[in-house]
């Protein structure tokens, strides 16, 4: 089972935040007040948030298919995530209350894990060359790509390489962008 836990960097007891499983942590709001995560409830994986101190979980998405990889934008205005709601894994964003869901990528790649630059103008993501459905396995042909937030244009940062699960699951920007 997968739950989300919290502990102090100084040590001490570990506190469980989520009461249902599976729950997969992905991000913390810029003000540290909320966590955002992917969880399976009622047979579907959707995006949830809750207070960083625990409490009631708030469902932010409810689409058929996998919603995963949620991450707050540095300005705290949006939550970016990947979704299979169109039949292809693409990058989406929504306001932090779950409203105004907007598709950000529209290509034939399977796009995962958008990580927003500190200046909120672009995002790096991993793209599988061949459609992987609702999976993000390791050991596949992938590229790192850059999404322009304003124009929604995506450009290659790398040529294809052997990677996948674990390549860029967490935020990896330099604080200066």
Predicted features by range, described:
Residues 1-16, 34, 38-59, 77-78, ...:
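Beta-propeller blade-edge and WD-like acidic-aromatic loop motif
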Residues 1, 19-38, 64-82, 108-123, ...:
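Conserved beta-propeller blade repeats
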């Amino acid at each position: 089972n997968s739950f989300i836990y919290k502990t102090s960097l100084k040590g001490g007891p570990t506190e469980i935040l989520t009461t249902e499983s599976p729950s997969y942590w992905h991000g913390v709001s810029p003000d540290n007040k909320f966590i955002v995560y992917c969880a399976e409830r009622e047979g579907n994986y959707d995006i949830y948030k809750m207070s960083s101190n625990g409490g009631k979980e708030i469902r932010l998405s409810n689409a058929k298919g996998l919603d995963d990889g949620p991450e707050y934008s540095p300005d705290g205005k949006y939550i970016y995530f990947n979704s299979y709601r169109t039949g292809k894994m693409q990058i989406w964003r929504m306001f932090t209350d779950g409203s105004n869901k907007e598709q950000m990528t529209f290509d034939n790649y399977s796009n995962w894990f958008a990580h927003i630059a500190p200046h909120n103008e672009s995002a790096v993501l991993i793209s599988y060359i061949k459609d992987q459905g609702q999976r993000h396995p390791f050991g596949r042909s992938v590229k790192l790509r850059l999404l322009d937030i304003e124009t929604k244009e995506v450009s290659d940062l790398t040529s294809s390489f052997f990677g996948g699960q674990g390549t860029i699951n967490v935020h990896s920007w330099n604080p200066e962008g």
